[in-house]
Amino acid sequence: MIYISPPFGNWVRHKDCIRVRGTFTTERRPGLIIQCLKTLRKVDGGWRNAIGFRNPGLENIEFKQDSIYSIAALDSKWYKLFGKLDKGINIEINVGCPNVNSYSITRPELKMLHRHYPNCSVKVSPHVTNNFLDILQNVGFKYIHLSNTLPTKKGGISGAKLKKKNLQLVKFVSNNYNFEIIAGGGIYTPQDVRDYAEAGAKHFSLSTVWFTPWRVKKVIEEIKLVSK
């Protein structure tokens, strides 16, 4: 499968892709456009941002079956989502964004999440620990999204710099765990797709390539080839 990663999934549509909308939090976090203008910058080897999940809040979202909804576990209140979302909604839990305060989601919370949404994917940090990967596999999660942006003092970096780190992570997870891997980070060319596929990715998440939409067709064609 091919995913359009947030924030692009909120606006971009493509017939061959699944939109991932969000990332949403239990409480409203205003200022998306302003934060994009203030922090989104082209840097050497990628893009840097410190958007920090600016969104209208879960209560103000109209959920649809044709999208996946990225939900952030920012604090212990995130469990409120169980009272707000139908079990038929497709979700991804984001536990590794560098632009917000960290919260260590617990094993009981992960068990509850998997019980309610067995097909939920988990998006993790590029610095995810073996212990956390062990917990995810033991709980029973099938899909893992590798990965969030690389943390820096000024925000998270995506693009080629992330790909270099992420390829190592995809290889490690593929060789040591039983997840279906969603790979994202620095996918701009057919070669990037092949690199991730050879490392063990089964699905692909497209993000800043949407800044250069003329690249997208060849990337998607290559994903279809490696997915046969």
Q: Where are the regions a protein language model picked out?
A:
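N-terminal capping/small domains of soluble enzymes
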Residues: M1-S76
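Hydrophobic faces of well-ordered beta-strands that scaffold small-molecule active sites
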Residues: I2-P6, C17-G22, S67-I71, I89-I93, ...
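Hydrophobic alpha-helical segments and helix pairs
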Residues: L81-L110
